[in-house]
Amino acid sequence: MTPDREITFVLTSCGRFDLLEETVHTFAACNTAPIARWVIVEDSGRPGVRDAVAGTGLPFEFIENDPPIGQMASIDRAYATVTTPYLFHCEDDWRFFRSGFVEESLVLLERLPEVSAVMCRRAGQNARHDAIVATAPPRTLEGVVYRLPPPHVDDVWFGYGFNPGLRRLADARAFGSFAARGHEKHASLWFKRRGMGMASLEVPACETTGQERHVGDATATPGWETVGRARPPGTVAAPRSRNDPCPCGSGERYKHCHGLPG
């Protein structure tokens, strides 16, 4: 792969080492694209992450947060080390089951500037995700079948997200600090305002394994934010209209910021 197409694999983990082990082993077994660097950021403050991935034989680099700093700040730490033009963002609770998906995603990102990231998860595990994807007809580009929902289909989601998928480093750099923005939903809104959104491969490549193991529950590591399920930190007084700017200074409308349901 030429330098202008190089990819860094970045995975966020938080103490669910059994799920992490399956994630990296199945990705390694299915992936056929050259990966320049393999980076894991571990935010549990617990030992075990190195042992969980040792069997892959891959040259993982580790960023271990102790004490934990949260997902968004962890993403900032990991992304700050990336120098390749593309990165495959992954979480610790996925199972991959087919090859070629990284190369297919690269085709879309190279040809479609309006695509912020390329998702590859299967249907049937997230009803809202499935409903958004279903609004777009299948399209084909250089043999890759995909869907690209228009930004207006959902008020908040599908502008950007942290499910497994390839994305451009340049877009992440343009966005800036994820921790400073607040939550995954605010990243999504930022990209939507710029007319960008996530594409979804018609032939899926992965499925989540952590639906019953959200990081905030008793079987996982305490103190982790459940991204997309909470308001931004702090409280503010509601403005007269939910369409007014949020008083917190985020630049979002109140209904898309502190006015989001908890």
Predicted regions, residues:
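C-terminal catalytic/acceptor-binding lobe
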Residues: 22, 157-239
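Acidic/negatively charged segments and metal-coordination signatures
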Residues: 231-262
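Conserved donor-nucleotide/metal-binding helix-loop-beta segment in metal-dependent transferases, i.e.
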Residues: 99-118
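Short beta-strand-to-loop element that shapes/binds the nucleotide-sugar donor at the catalytic cleft/hinge
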Residues: 118-133
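Glycine-rich, basic loop-to-helix element that forms the pyrophosphate-binding segment
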Residues: 66-81
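Short beta-strand-to-loop acidic/aromatic patch adjacent to the donor-nucleotide binding site
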Residues: 85-95
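A conserved acidic beta->alpha catalytic loop
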Residues: 40-50
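Short, well-formed alpha-helical segments that are part of the catalytic scaffolds
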Residues: 16-30
